Amino acid sequence: MKKAKILSGVLLLCFSSPLISQAATLDVRGGYRSGSHAYETRLKVSEGWQNGWWASMESNTWNTIHDNKKENAALNDVQVEVNYAIKLDDQWTVRPGMLTHFSSNGTRYGPYVKLSWDATKDLKFGIRYRYDWKAYRQQDLSGDMSRDNVHRWDGYVTYHINSDFTFAWQTTLYSKQNDYRYANHKKWATENAFVLQYHMTPDITPYIEYDYLDRQGVYNGRDNLSENSYRIGVSFKL
């Protein structure tokens, strides 16, 4: 009930200012992870405002990918994200923001700051640092109850190929702060995501995505499996 009230409040915030808001976007995505033999679905609603604010809410559902003691995550989760764009000039933008993640395990907060550079009209770069702090404790490798907090660095490249296609690459490095390990048996892990969007109409954009997720696969009690993610989705301007 408490979570529902929070999400209702965020939705009200996102859609209560039509005079200054841009078009909202609905993103529907499905995916499959080869190492974990897992399926995912995601629904995401986002909206930006002309005064610099941006907000989103998304819901993720998995099958049994996390049905393993070595994987500290939940099968279903909801997250809310808010950021504010500060224009430094015509090319550079700083975006401080906050991501709040709700799951059956508890709540995670992810304050971040992102720096974006519009090199040209068609080519854009970005870097972001985020600190994921968990409001709940989990057993660490020493058997103690601690917080599995994470430092996260992201890099972004977006290239507008032509009026029909856009290509994007996101690279991510995770580093655990305390005595925990990823499924690759290390304190750090990497991810690389490659996305190709097709602008079918001004309001409808289907896309495909391939991610290499390091050796983070978990399946039937085994971990350290090579993990590939294949996704397909479509976004709609509402």
Curated annotation (Swiss-Prot):
Q: Which UniProt keywords apply?
A: Cell outer membrane, Ion transport, Membrane, Porin, Signal, Sugar transport, Transmembrane, Transmembrane beta strand, Transport
Classification lineage: Bacteria, Pseudomonadati, Pseudomonadota, Gammaproteobacteria, Enterobacterales
Q: What is its main location?
A: membrane
Official protein name in the record: N-acetylneuraminic acid outer membrane channel protein NanC
- InterPro entries under this entry? Bact_OM_Channel_sf (IPR053713), Oligogalacturonate-sp_porin (IPR009331)
Q: Which organism is it from?
A: Escherichia coli O6:H1 (strain CFT073 / ATCC 700928 / UPEC)
Q: Which residues form the signal peptide?
A: 1-23
Question: Any ranges marked Periplasmic in the topology annotation, and which?
Answer: 24-25, 50-52, 87-91, 118-122, 160-164, 201-203, 237-238
Transmembrane domains' residue ranges: 26-32, 40-49, 53-61, 77-86, 92-102, 108-117, 123-132, 152-159, 165-173, 191-200, 204-212, 229-236
The family line of this record is: Belongs to the oligogalacturonate-specific porin KdgM (TC 1.B.35) family. NanC subfamily.
Q: What does this protein do?
A: Outer membrane channel protein allowing the entry of N-acetylneuraminic acid (Neu5Ac, the most abundant sialic acid on host cell surfaces) into the bacteria. NanC proteins form high-conductance channels which are open at low membrane potentials and which have a weak anion selectivity.
| One Pfam family named in its UniProt record | KdgM
Q: How does it assemble?
A: Monomer.
Keyword hit for NADP? no
Classification via SUPFAM superfamilies: Porins
